[in-house]
Amino acid sequence: KAVWEAGAEIIAVQATHHYRDDGKLAYETIREIKENIPEALIFADVSTAEDARIAAEMGADFVAPTLAGYTKAGAFDKLEIKDAPDYILLRDIVDAVKGTGARVIMEGKVATPEIAVQCLYMGAYAVVVGNAITRPHITAKRFARALNRFHD
């Protein structure tokens, strides 16, 4: 409630199959906020398409695979360097929330304008461009890795 009273119009919450300190699943936070502040927009950070479906059913206005790879359910091989979003997960999330009113925000590995447009074509309502802007050394490493592959 303090976040809302401070002026936030959108409240981001973890919406995964993890238990909070009070023993409830993280998804429950969405329902609790909507019950107390119905006009609040909820941005659900999810890990899987199932998380997205549950979050949307609980009342999330936006879902994003922000936590993909960071939870047990959405884990991927940390040794593998991924230079592109998980398009299969994006498609699955778009399908999972279809008809619920929740909008999909693609977040993670949106490193080029072409990737951003591809995500929109696949059903994302919007994209978040993070590291490509805020950490240019990571963008430079991606280019170097791709160009080095050409010479291999």
Where are these regions (language model features)?
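Active-site beta->alpha loop and helix N-cap motifs at the rims of alpha/beta catalytic domains
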Residues: K1-G23, L41
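Short beta-strand/loop segments at the ligand-binding rim of alpha/beta enzyme cores
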Residues: K34-A44, A96-E107
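Catalytic cores of alpha/beta
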Residues: K1-V3, S47-D61, R103-M106, V110-V127
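Short secondary-structure boundary segments
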Residues: A15, V46, L67-A68, G108-K109, ...
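Long hydrophobic alpha-helical segments typical of transmembrane helices together
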Residues: K109-D152
